């Protein structure tokens, strides 16, 4: 995995960290950690989420593919998971490098 860019945060979207990466499989992903609410929810509700979205090379969604969504009750745990996910991105999502096709001789 290669980090392409730490994206600027959008405060109104309650973003805490937003990272644009390229996986071992050559596809592009956004890793986003954010607060689910702008108010204090009841204690039985998770308050933060980290998710991964598959994107095109410019970071736009072509289809909504989210290979990972995880919710947390504490902001520090969500941010720690975001960092851990970046460190072990390919292993966590079980990404493999694309197979190289050999060129046929004579063509």
Predicted feature descriptions by range:
Residues 1-56:
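Short N-terminal "domain-start" leader segments
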Residues 62-77:
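A short, exposed loop/beta-hairpin motif centered on an aromatic-Gly-Thr core
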Residues 69, 83-98:
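Short arginine-rich
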Residues 104-107:
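Short acidic DE-rich linear segments
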């Amino acid at each position: 995995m290669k980090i392409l860019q730490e994206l600027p945060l959008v405060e109104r979207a309650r973003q805490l960290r937003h990272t644009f990466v390229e996986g071992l499989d050559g596809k592009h992903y956004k890793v986003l950690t954010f607060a689910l609410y702008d108010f204090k929810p009841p204690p039985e509700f998770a308050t933060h989420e980290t998710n991964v979205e598959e994107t095109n090379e410019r970071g736009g969604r072509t289809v909504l593919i989210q290979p990972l969504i995880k919710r947390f009750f504490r902001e520090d745990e969500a941010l720690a998971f975001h960092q851990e996910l970046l460190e072990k991105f390919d292993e966590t999502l079980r990404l493999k490098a694309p197979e190289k096709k050999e060129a046929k001789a004579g063509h």
